[in-house]
Swiss-Prot record:
The lineage of its organism: Eukaryota, Metazoa, Ecdysozoa, Nematoda, Chromadorea. GO terms for cellular component: Golgi trans cisterna; membrane; presynapse. This is Putative syntaxin 6. It is a single-pass type IV membrane protein. It comes from Caenorhabditis elegans. GO terms for molecular function: SNAP receptor activity. The gene is syx-6.
Length: 122
């Protein structure tokens, strides 16, 4: 792309020497200007196509990441449910109020431990 800046043209800046002397020169200059504009439009078109491709790839990536985040959210909810269940069971075990319940639990667990050791040794 060219770095042309457009500014207001003062009448004093125009001289007869700057102006083409024949219609053929005017036509040639106009064709050159049109060709330059076509070349610049082609560059702009290429840039637009590149940006379109990039935006399409970004959209695809966002769709994939959205799906992955949804899956992660579902797995987190499942894990949270399982953790809540385990915490409730632990709370129930640790809140045995009376000593007789605690003693019964200790005896049952001890008997289970001895049974497992006996089975492993035999």
């Amino acid at each position: 792309m060219s770095n042309y800046r457009y500014s207001k043209l003062n009448e004093e800046e125009i001289s007869l020497e700057d102006m083409p002397s024949s219609a053929n020169q005017i036509l040639t200059r106009q064709e050159q200007i049109i060709q330059e504009q076509d070349d610049e439009l082609e560059l702009v078109g290429n840039s637009v196509r590149t940006l379109r491709g990039m935006s399409s790839m970004i959209g695809d990536e966002l769709d994939q990441q959205s799906t992955m985040l949804d899956d992660l959210g579902q797995e987190m909810e499942y894990s949270e449910t399982r953790l809540d269940t385990a915490m409730k069971k632990m709370a129930k075990l640790t809140h045995l109020e009376d000593e007789s319940s605690q003693c019964k639990m200790i005896m049952v667990l001890s008997a289970l431990l001895f049974f497992l050791v006996f089975v492993l040794l035999v």
